Amino acid sequence: DKGLTPKALNATIAQKVGMPGRTLIWGDGPSGDLYFDKGLSAAERTRVETETLALLRAHPQVAAVFTKAQIAATPAPTGRPENWSLIEEARASFYPERSGDLLLLLKPNVMAIPEQAVMGAVATHGSPWDMDRRVPILFWRKGMRPFEQPLGIETVDIMPSLAALIGLPVPQNEIDGRCLDLIAGDG
């Protein structure tokens, strides 16, 4: 929906809060980080945030909208990434000095680029959904049987997994990541 683009969202919110023509909201596209004008007074910012949250949370294509404060207050996630909640996924990529004032997450299978691509964009930085998060990593060697690791992995798991495959000892307490089962069959 083009109404979710930062430009359209800004025009709607600016009208609602009585500041038409002023750029109140900045962003890179219709999902992800949204930034408020740093020149807003505390009262103006609260009004802009309240109206923006209400509008976005009522939109049928929006899965969630989190404020910077909500994300910052969320403990860093632990455990397997496939078990994280949306706010934990947001927290895992949160950087206080650079992250937006709001994080807009669209529902699964909603493309963040409306028809007649916005700003010439043809791709995004992804989403919290498996279709964007799960990236295939292929290991192959002569005689290796096909096997799909059903559990979520992280890129830091590649090195200890390959090290184990070639018999290279790696002290587990000195590296990030874990050794993955790459061999088909039991054990």
Model regions and ranges:
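Secreted, luminal/periplasmic, and some membrane-associated catalytic domains
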Residues: 1-115
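Sec-exported extracytoplasmic/periplasmic mature domains
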Residues: 57-61, 163-171, 185
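Substrate-binding/catalytic groove segments of enzymes
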Residues: 111-115, 144-148, 168, 172
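Short, surface-exposed loop/helix-turn segments at secondary-structure junctions
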Residues: 114-123
